[in-house]
A protein has these predicted regions:
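Short beta-strand->alpha-helix linker/helix-N-cap micro-motif
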Residues: 22-31, 43-73
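Charge-biased low-complexity segments
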Residues: 23, 140-141, 160-289
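Envelope-exposed proteins and targeting segments
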Residues: 22-25, 38, 42, 50, ...
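Bacterial N-terminal signal peptides
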Residues: 5-17
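Second-shell loop/turn segments in exported
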Residues: 27-33, 67-71, 140-144, 240-245
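C-terminal/domain-edge helix-coil "capping" segments
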Residues: 19-25, 34-49, 83-86, 110, ...
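Scaffold/interface architecture of coatomer-like assemblies
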Residues: 104-105, 126, 269
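Short, solvent-exposed, polar/charged sequence segments at loop or secondary-structure edges
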Residues: 55-104, 110-111
Length: 289
């Protein structure tokens, strides 16, 4: 009985401290003082919570500059992993913060204070979650103040996401597959190379375009989303993975669209074969009617 209680205590201790060994970097939210201030306040919120080690702001800034990071929120998995390796933390936060003068039919003049936040896993390069809290007020200072008041809730949601990702990635590393993954050939770079190898690339029956979601419209987001899609020998879409993320709901819109598509399968020497293809979608805000 004593051993059982001791084992439970050790398990609880390890669970409580597994996050403390993980770290997070917060990259400045743009070059403005507003962006730097919000990033620093977010670091302070993380430190107060105590769940994760928080990287030094100056070291984070130097590491990001050292690999040429210039503020993009539209990265490939490789680019995201490279940035994470330079920052030397388990997770990192990217973003953008501004206070903008706006106008509308209802309000001739008002101010919007917003903060775009992307949480990224350094190990996988995946975009774990994104958020864009926004507050309007007739005075810029009050709009900004409302945004700052929201940072406690924002940091709490990010901490929950990091806890979940820590556990998920730990399980990914420990799970042993019961059978080897099927070998799926990657598509050659272009049709000429494919033809020289006796192959024909998959072709969609009908090209579908993802809808531009309202969440992207609110942010005036323009970005490129790349997905790697496995097309079976029957022409049906299997696994779809984001390899260049953009946030703002664009990734989800892309995956949902690709999964609705049907293809003429790839051929090799006249025989249908499964193939992994890269599909790219460029998003631009539609013009106003």
């Amino acid at each position: 009985m004593i051993r059982f209680i001791h084992a439970i205590f050790v398990l609880a201790f390890l669970t409580a401290n597994c996050y403390a060994n993980s770290s997070v970097s917060v990259v400045d939210f743009g070059a403005s003082e507003t962006g730097k201030s919000v990033a620093e306040k977010l670091r302070a919120q993380f430190r107060t919570a105590g769940d994760f080690l928080v990287a030094d702001a100056d070291l984070t800034r130097s590491a990001a500059m050292g690999v040429g990071y210039a503020g993009s929120l539209n990265l490939t998995l490789d680019e995201a992993r490279d940035l994470g390796a330079a920052l030397a933390s388990d997770f990192y936060v990217l973003g953008d913060t501004r206070v903008l003068r706006r106008s509308s039919f209802e309000k001739p003049v008002y101010f919007e204070a917003y903060c775009t936040v992307f949480l990224v896993s350094s190990r996988t390069g995946r975009l774990l979650t994104w958020s864009r809290p926004s507050f309007n007020n007739a005075e810029p200072g009050k709009a900004y103040g409302l945004l700052l008041q929201n940072l406690a809730d924002l940091s709490h949601s990010l901490i929950i996401a990091m806890r979940r990702a820590t556990e998920d990635e730990r399980l990914e590393r420990t799970v042993i597959p019961t059978s080897p993954a099927p070998l799926i050939e990657a598509a050659p770079d272009d049709e000429k190379v494919a033809a020289a190898q006796g192959m024909r690339l998959p072709r969609p029956f009908k090209r579908l375009r993802p809808e531009y979601p309202d969440s992207a419209a609110l942010a005036d987001a323009e970005a490129t989303v790349d997905v790697a899609a496995e097309i079976g020998a029957d022409g049906e879409v299997g696994d779809v993975q984001i390899v260049r993320w953009a946030g703002f709901g664009l990734d989800q819109a892309t995956v949902a669209t690709v999964k609705q598509m049907h293809f003429f399968p790839a051929l090799k020497n006249g025989t249908a074969i499964p193939m992994r293809v890269l599909l790219r979608y460029n998003f631009r805000k539609p013009p106003k009617d």
